[in-house]
Structure formats: C-alpha cells, structure tokens
Amino acid sequence: MPEFEIQHTTRYIYEGTVRDSANQVILYPIVDDYQEVIRQEVTITGNPDVDVHTDYFGNQIGSFTYTDPHNVMVINSRVLVTTKHRTLPVNDIFPSHQWEDLKRLQTIVPYIDFLKQEYFEGLDELQEVVNKERNSDDTPYQIVLRFCQYVFDNFEYIKGVTTVDTKLDQIWKMKQGVCQDFAHILIEMLRILQIPARYVSGYICTNSNGMRGEGATHAWVEAFIPDYGWLGIDPTNNCIANDTHVRLAVGRNFSDCSPVKGVYKGSSNHKLSVTVSVDQESLPPGQHQVIEVPIADQVTEFTKNSYQRYMEMIQMQQQQQQQQQEKQLQQ
C-alpha cells in the first residue's frame, strides 16, 4: 500500500503592509476506503486559529483570519497519507441498462450539480466531437476512456498560457493549457452525455519521471459509472487515477476546490508562489525520491486582490449614481 509524505507550501508576498487577511484552505486530503491520512500538520504565519468544517461536497475546509499587520504570509501543509489500489469497473453489463441507470440520476440531488453544462461559444463544436467520438453500443466506462484519450491527443500541455480564471472558450480555441484546463474540457464532454462528472484537486505521486503534474498540485476528473461509483480519470496523462493520485477535494470545477484563496486589506498588490514536494515512504531504504517543483503557472506577479477590486467596484458604482443625480438636478 503506497505511503506518501507531501509538503505543500503557499507563500504570499505583499507589496506593502496588509492586515485582516481572511483565507480559506482546502489542504486536508479526503478520507475514505481508498485513502487514509496518518498524520498532518498545517502551520500558518502568525499561528491563527483555523476553523475546520465540511462543505456541501464533503470536503474539509479550513478558515482563518490573520489580523496583525504583515507583508508575508506562509501556509504550509505537511501530510502523511496512504492510498489503496481500486479495481476497475466490470464492463459486462448491457450498455442500455447502464444508460438507463444514468438517466435516473438526473433528478437525484447529489448528482445534479455534476450534470450541469457550462455554456460557451464552442459548445456546438464540442457537441459535434462528442457525437463523432461516441459509438452507439458504448458503455459509459468506454465513453470515459475514449473522451479522456481525445483530450490527451488533441490538447497540448503548456504551462503559462492559461490561468485559473481562463474560460472554456479560450481553452477550446487554443487547445492548450495545463491540468485544470484538460479536466474542465473532459468534464464538459461527459456532461453533454449526461454522465455525472466532477473536478478533483490533489497530487500525483509516482516514483518515475515523465508524468505531467508530477510533484505538484494536480487536477483530474471523476466520472460516475453505474454499479461502480466514481471513477478517477486523468486526461493530462491519459490514465486511470488510482493509488498514485492523492485527492484533496471534489467539486463542480476549480473554484470549488482551490487549495488556498482569500482577501485582505491594505496594499492592492501581491505575489504568490506555490511549491510541493513528495516523498514516497514505501520505497526501500536509500531509494526515496523527493521531487520539489515550483509551480511556474501558479506564480503571479503583483496583482490587485479581490478585496481591492470589490472596493473599486463599489466606488465606481457610487460615482455613477452621483453623476446620474447631478444630471437629474440639472434637468
């Protein structure tokens, strides 16, 4: 049974002194029959109290506020987790029966959120691709594998061309991006055929080189297969997400699973850097591989924070209202 020690460090460097930093962290690995947390330590600059609760999707969410003036904030998670290999779906059930089972899920609350499509300009083109790639006698499992292959073959893995805010329109047009972009496209394809699909954030932990996303935060997809449950599928690497994938959170998209996000008061600009290291504990003595990779596409130069953008928006609205009032008085 694989055992991984993972260290995930998030560092904010502010252009000036800030305060009242309110943050949400999703750094607590999922615990279920196939994944177990042996121990975990989360440390944060200023040692604020962290309130941990479970969200709608079953993820463990930590919330904290750091009120003291500061110009640097570091959030560090160190966790030891074990994973268990899961057998693959048995593909011997009549396809028609499986598709009927999926139809029944369309009105069941836990699955509705994972069936909603996101409209974008290229949706009609994607619909054509889905129809072309699908065979009439395919099972949902076969569809998942084929669509995963399609994304892997037709999208180019390039860091830096997209951000977490990049829309499906841009991803579809460029046919380029990183793991979260590959995941979002595959999710949309599966939902077109009413296969429940959800976004997964976590880590990919292997002792061999060549896997995209290795040693860094990663994203993939889980698709619901009748008589099996949620199947992890990684379109970035065209593989089943099994015991080398450590899950942090699941949701409708990246926004539901962002490892760290928050707002603050003060200087409007900041710089963010993220590093992840993975040590595979199950390797024989002397053969431990520690991979430390700065996530280039998650490093942003000084940019305005959401609190500042919100205040600017409010100020703009007030100015517009004032101008309208002045015009009315002049009339």
Briefly describe each language-model feature range.
Residues 78-117, 285-293, 297-308:
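Secretory-pathway-linked proteins and extracytosolic
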Residues 25-27, 41-42, 59, 91-100, ...:
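Short intrinsically disordered coil segments
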Residues 2, 8, 21-23, 40, ...:
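Structural beta-strand/beta-sheet cores of well-ordered domains, especially the beta-sheet scaffolds
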Residues 149, 181-268:
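Hydrophobic/aromatic-rich core segments of domains that either
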Residues 279-331:
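Alpha-helical and coiled-coil interaction segments, frequently adjacent to or embedded
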Residues 1-87, 94-97:
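Intrinsically disordered, low-complexity N-terminal segments that are enriched in acidic
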Residues 83, 101, 105-177, 185, ...:
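Secondary-structure boundary elements
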Residues 14, 81, 225, 278-280:
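Short beta-strand segments enriched in hydrophobic/aromatic residues
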